[in-house]
Every structure is written in structure tokens, then in C-alpha cells.
């Protein structure tokens, strides 16, 4: 084929392999019915299969064993309908490796094939023996029809030659052998075979000798076949004898034919569910609880999903949900089938409506898959509501582990949000739990501000923010604890959803400003000159901190409140919190932390500092401030004079005068700051008050903390 045709081949393999191959070859008139030659006769078919049919070559063993299971299940159906009268005998599937011969053999005692069936199902690659069988036994066989055809040809990914030895269950059937070396040519001859069923013999090529190693085969069988409904035998059971392990006569069956999800929930105990979880994920903590899925319409789905205890070091790539099709392992990449917010769940989903060979684009577009995702969301919310209703105490005890699942679901799925409103919990700093409605009723009488907005106070660290929590509680307010990974986003969502409500962290402002009850004025307010002077005093005593900015403010808070309080701007802090867990917000993450250092002008110690500063510095500052006042008036006059004028219309003398005045003002302000800093440096009380505020916020560290302790001892 030309390069363009080969490219077309590769692109088609992404989605529905069987249908696409049919279309390509029908379009190019490559389908032929020539004896001794496969119906798809391109020389390139096998290289394409080897390279592109499956991303993982080890999938071949799943396909071959799955076909053996299908053949065995079909035999059981025929026996149940009376079409087979003979004894079924041993129905085990056997996998055997022969390193000397270089072969891997998968044998079954299923329905086998006649010469005509080999022609139809093996030689005509793009057709499936399941369709005809399904039509004939559609009332009974739907759940056991697998995918035949290209699945068999996956064996050529690891083999230089493949043989089929088969004898049909049909009376008088002749056993046949089919063989192919990976070219379009094949051979088929009559052979002697006494036992019904099929042997698939793979002559493993030199690049894939690993698939003859016992440990490698066992690993693959446990990965793909551990829950198949027909016993799969690989080797013999062993026992300890004469100082070593030796084989016994007992077959080693590697699979559990009736895993927990295939049984009725009424037949399972809690211990059964826990044991199955331990088998799936050895060595991790017991799950919080589980959900048993079972639906027949409009699609078939069974499974068990477990809610694990989430730890910071959990390996989400190791403990994934496993997807099965008729108990055959398909993948543990279940994006699109399981909603994103439930990807941290663990367990098993089994659905014959999801084919064995699926691509991500298929999962994203298939209507059944979308329905399955919606159904899982619904079942999870129903189960959570059920536990909440029946045992709220248990639900609250597990809330810290459940919280991340539920908040993520409410953030990402509108329908889940609607259902979860009834059982999502808010936890306060006293470790009490409330639903949204319960908490609203608790605080609406006391935490509604003058504008009618309900104010939800919250903390993110009970220890670090203790003084702020204590102040709020002393006013009769309740404070929520919102310290989860998703809480910044969850808070933002609740503010959008809940009417006339806002969330504020308890340290983001003074408590009387967080829940403002009225507009009040105070007699202790400072004038502009006092504010400028005291700003220099207090700012000079704030120790240098990396990526931190402080704005000094003066507020009358009451004589019994702290002399200085440090708060953090709510908006900027939220943006930085979200930047830590959300891409596209890196700009906010790089900004410095923004704090307000609020001096309580009602407190006696603050008033003492203000009065002492004015008294001690008055003689030095008065001439500077008087001169600065004159200079500022001159600057104001010159700026007014150049207003609405173009640059070339302003006299050069005025430009020079303005420049000189601005430089003079800068010089005078620097002198003022130096005087105030010198005074503050010599007045331990100023630095002590600042350090106390920093200490209460866990912001005093290293050398600054050591100096504070030494100064405290001296002052005592």
C-alpha cells in the first residue's frame, strides 16, 4: 500500500477496529475469498496488527483466554437448552508454556469449530462468530458473548506462527488444524483429536521470549483473568517437601469464578466486602464503606465501589478502579466512565456494554458510557444519603475522610450538588457538625450584618488563629473550620449558591468589621498628621519578612481588645490559596502576602505610645513639619498652575521649581522618618506590641523571636 493508505490504516485503529477494517477493505476492493489465503489479503495486515492493534502486547493472553471462556460458556448454553446430550466433562481452561519448544498453549473444552467454522470465523478476519450465536440464543446468551475475530489475531503480536487444533461438539465432526506464519497464506488439514474443544498454540518469536517465563505468564493471568467465570489452570499446586516446594497432582486454578460483585448483596456480609477489598488492594487500610452496583436497564452494569481513607501519601496510580467486561479485565484507566470527582474511589465495574478494546475517544463519545457515569453519580449520592439518614453518628465520624469526595462532587457536578445539599456537613471549631440548613438556622439570628447579609466566619487553622476565634466566640459568634484542600473553591461556590451570604476568614479583619452591625464613630480617631507620624513609628518596627507586605492602619476597637491586631486581606489570600491548587493562577501565587497591622486606638497601651511619641518628638518634628507644610503648599500651587497645559507651555522656571520642591519634600519626610524610627528603636514598648501581634499569628521566628523573648524578660 502507499504511505497515504498506511496512514489511513493507523488512524482507523484508534476507534472501532473491526468496523473500520471492513470499511477500508470494502472501499479498496481488497476483500477476496481465495482458498489458502486469508480474506483480508494485504501484505501489511500483520505488521499493522503487531504494531497498532493494541498498545500493550501482553493483551494477547487476555484475548486468547477470553475466547476460550466464550467457547466454554457457549457450550454451557447449548447444554442448558438440550442441544448437547453428552456429559460436558472437564471444562477447565489450561495455559501451558514449553520453553524448549518455544510454545505457549491455551486449551479449552468448549464448543470447538468445524472446518467451515474455521473458514468463517478465522479466515474472514473482520467477522465475529458471536453475532450468529447471539441471534440464535439471544434470550440466554447475551451476557456470555465475547469478541471473536481480531482478538485471536492479537496472538501474532508475539508469535512467528500460530496453530489452532480444534474439534467441534457437533456429532460426526472432523478435527482440523489451522496454521499461519503471519503472512496472508495459511494451511488447514484434517487431524486426529479425541477431545472436544480448541488448542491455540503460539510459537513465540525471539523478541517476546519473556512470555514463556512462568512468572510473567502468571502475572498476566492474575492481571487479566483473575475473575473469569471459567476455571483457568496454570501449573500445579505446590507443597513443601524435603526442604523445597514440589508440584502436587492438584491443578492450580488462578481465578476466582464468583467474585463479590457477581453475587447478590443479600448474600454478602460486611466481612465479605472487606475481604474482597483486601484481595484487590493488599496492605492498605479498610475502606470507609462501599456501594454495590447492579443495573440491567438501559444498560447492564455490576460492580462494587469502595470509599478509601484518603492519605497524603496515597498512590492514586496504584489503587485505581478496575474496569471489567464479563469478568475480563479491560483497563484501570476509567476516565469518562467514572466521574472525575470519584476517581479516588476504588473497586470494580463490570459492563458488557463497554467492549474489551476501547479507546479514550470512544469512551468520551459513547452514549452508554455517559449513562453509566450518570448512574454511578446517582448511586453514590443515594448511598451517602442512606448512611446519613440511618446512622448520622457514623457519617460524622467519617466526615473528615468523606469530605474531599463530596466537596469535589458538588464543585464539578451540578446534579450531585443538588443531591448533596441534604447531607454535606459543615464542621465548626468546636467539632460540631451541621447541614447547610441547620447551620443557617444556628447563625442567622446573630451573624446577620446591617445590610441583611448572613456572615459565615471560618478559620483554617485552629491553633494559629486561636486568638481570632476566641474573640469571635466571646461575641457569641460561631466559627467554621474550613481546612480542607478544596475548601477555598468550596467556599466560593457556596457564596454563589447561597442567597445573601458571604464567607470571611476570622483573621481577615476586625471582628466588628467582619459582621458590621451599625455605622459608628469614635472619639479616639487620629487626625491625618497623627496617622502619618504613627504609621512611621509602627512600620519601622515590623521585622523584614520575605514576600510579605504590611499596611499600618488605626481603628478604635475597644479598650478591652488587643492593642495591635494583624489581619490578612480576604480576597488576596483566597486568590493565593486557589493558585496553589489551580493552574492558570500562578500570577497570584507569586504576589507577596498582604497583611494589615491594625493599631487599636482605644487601647491604653496604644494611646500611651501615641502620646509619648508626640511628646518626645515634638520639638524635633515641629520645624520639619512646618517646613513640609509650606513645601507641600508650593507643590500644590505649581501642580495647579500646569494643569491642562502641554509640556512645552509650562515655563522652565516652574518645572525647575516643582522638581526642587518635590525633592525637598522627600528630604523632609526622610528626616521625619529617621527621627521617628530612632525614637521607636529606643522605645521597647513599640516593638513589643508589634511582636506580640506577630507572635499571635505564628509569624515571629528566628532572630526576631529570640530578641522578643530577651526583651520580654528585661521588661518584666
Regions found by a protein language model. Give the residues of each.
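GHKL (Bergerat-fold) ATPase N-terminal catalytic module, capturing the glycine-rich phosphate-binding loop
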Residues: 2, 20, 24-211, 219, ...
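Acidic/polar hotspots within intrinsically disordered regions
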Residues: 15-16
Amino acid at each position: 500500500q502507499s504511505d497515504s493508505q498506511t496512514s489511513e490504516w493507523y488512524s482507523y485503529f484508534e476507534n472501532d477496529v473491526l468496523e473500520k477494517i471492513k470499511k477500508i477493505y470494502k472501499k479498496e476492493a481488497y476483500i477476496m475469498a481465495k482458498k489458502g489465503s486469508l480474506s483480508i489479503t494485504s501484505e501489511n495486515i500483520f505488521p499493522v496488527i503487531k504494531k497498532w492493534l493494541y498498545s500493550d502486547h501482553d493483551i494477547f493472553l487476555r484475548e486468547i483466554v477470553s475466547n476460550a471462556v466464550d467457547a466454554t460458556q457457549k457450550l454451557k448454553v447449548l447444554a442448558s437448552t438440550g442441544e448437547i446430550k453428552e456429559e460436558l466433562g472437564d471444562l477447565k481452561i489450561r495455559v501451558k508454556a514449553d520453553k524448549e519448544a518455544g510454545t505457549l498453549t491455551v486449551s479449552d473444552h468448549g464448543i470447538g469449530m468445524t472446518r467451515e467454522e474455521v473458514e468463517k470465523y478465522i479466515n474472514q478476519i473482520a467477522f465475529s462468530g458471536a453475532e450468529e450465536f447471539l441471534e440464535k440464543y439471544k434470550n440466554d446468551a447475551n451476557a456470555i458473548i465475547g469478541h471473536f475475530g481480531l482478538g485471536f489475531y492479537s496472538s501474532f503480536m508475539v508469535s512467528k506462527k500460530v496453530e489452532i487444533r480444534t474439534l467441534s461438539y457437533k456429532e460426526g465432526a472432523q478435527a482440523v488444524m489451522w496454521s499461519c506464519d503471519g503472512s496472508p497464506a495459511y494451511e488447514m488439514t484434517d487431524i486426529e483429536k479425541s477431545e472436544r474443544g480448541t488448542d491455540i498454540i503460539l510459537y513465540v518469536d525471539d523478541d517476546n521470549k519473556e512470555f514463556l517465563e512462568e512468572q510473567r505468564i502468571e502475572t498476566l493471568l492474575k492481571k487479566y483473568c483473575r475473575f473469569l467465570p471459567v476455571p483457568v489452570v496454570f501449573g500445579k499446586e505446590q507443597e513443601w517437601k524435603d526442604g523445597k516446594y514440589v508440584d502436587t497432582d492438584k491443578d492450580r486454578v488462578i481465578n476466582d469464578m464468583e467474585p463479590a460483585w457477581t453475587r447478590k448483596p443479600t448474600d454478602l456480609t460486611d466481612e465479605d466486602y472487606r475481604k474482597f477489598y483486601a484481595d484487590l488492594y493488599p496492605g492498605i487500610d479498610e475502606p470507609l464503606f462501599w456501594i454495590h452496583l447492579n443495573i440491567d436497564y438501559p444498560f447492564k452494569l455490576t460492580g462494587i465501589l469502595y470509599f478509601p481513607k484518603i492519605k497524603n501519601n496515597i498512590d492514586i496510580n496504584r489503587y485505581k478502579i478496575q474496569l471489567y467486561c464479563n469478568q475480563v479485565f479491560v483497563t484501570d484507566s476509567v476516565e469518562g466512565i467514572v466521574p472525575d470527582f470519584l476517581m479516588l474511589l476504588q473497586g470494580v465495574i463490570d459492563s458488557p456494554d463497554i467492549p474489551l478494546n476501547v479507546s479514550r475517544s470512544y469512551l468520551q463519545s459513547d452514549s452508554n458510557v455517559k449513562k453509566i457515569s450518570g448512574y454511578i453519580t446517582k448511586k453514590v449520592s443515594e448511598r451517602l444519603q442512606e448512611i446519613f439518614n440511618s446512622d448520622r453518628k457514623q457519617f460524622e465520624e467519617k466526615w473528615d475522610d468523606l469530605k474531599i469526595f463530596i466537596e469535589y462532587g458538588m464543585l464539578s457536578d451540578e446534579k450531585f450538588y443538588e443531591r448533596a445539599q441534604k447531607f454535606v456537613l459543615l464542621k465548626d471549631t468546636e467539632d460540631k457538625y451541621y447541614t447547610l440548613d441547620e447551620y443557617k438556622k444556628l447563625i442567622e439570628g446573630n451573624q446577620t450584618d446591617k445590610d441583611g447579609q448572613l456572615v459565615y466566619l471560618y478559620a483554617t487553622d485552629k491553633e494559629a488563629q486561636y486568638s481570632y476565634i476566641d474573640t469571635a466566640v466571646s461575641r457569641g459568634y460561631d466559627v467554621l473550620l474550613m481546612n480542607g484542600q478544596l475548601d477555598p473553591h468550596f467556599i466560593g461556590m457556596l457564596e454563589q449558591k447561597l442567597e445573601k451570604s458571604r464567607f470571611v476568614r476570622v483573621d481577615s479583619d476586625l471582628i466588628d468589621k467582619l459582621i458590621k452591625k451599625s455605622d459608628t464613630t469614635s472619639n479616639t480617631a487620629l487626625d491625618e498628621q497623627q496617622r502619618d507620624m504613627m504609621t512611621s513609628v509602627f512600620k519601622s518596627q515590623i521585622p523584614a519578612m520575605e514576600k510579605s507586605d504590611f499596611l499600618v492602619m488605626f481603628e478604635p476597637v475597644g479598650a478591652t481588645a488587643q492593642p495591635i491586631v494583624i489581619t490578612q486581606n480576604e480576597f488576596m489570600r483566597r486568590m493565593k490559596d486557589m493558585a496553589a491548587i489551580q493552574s492558570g493562577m500562578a500570577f497570584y501565587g507569586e504576589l507577596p502576602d498582604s497583611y494589615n497591622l491594625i493599631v487599636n486606638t482605644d487601647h491604653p497601651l496604644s494611646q500611651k505610645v501615641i502620646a509619648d511619641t508626640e511628646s518626645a518628638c515634638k520639638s524635633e518634628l515641629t520645624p520639619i513639619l512646618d517646613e513640609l507644610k509650606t513645601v507641600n503648599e508650593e507643590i500644590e500651587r505649581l501642580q495647579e498652575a500646569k494643569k491642562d497645559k502641554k509640556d512645552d507651555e509650562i515655563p522652565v522656571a516652574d518645572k525647575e521649581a516643582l522638581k526642587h520642591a518635590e525633592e525637598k519634600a522627600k528630604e523632609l519626610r526622610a528626616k521625619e522618618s529617621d527621627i521617628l524610627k530612632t525614637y521607636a528603636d529606643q522605645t521597647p514598648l513599640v516593638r513589643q506590641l508589634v511582636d506580640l501581634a506577630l507572635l499571635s499569628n505564628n509569624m515571629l521566628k528566628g532572630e526576631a523571636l529570640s530578641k522578643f523573648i530577651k526583651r520580654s524578660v528585661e521588661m518584666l
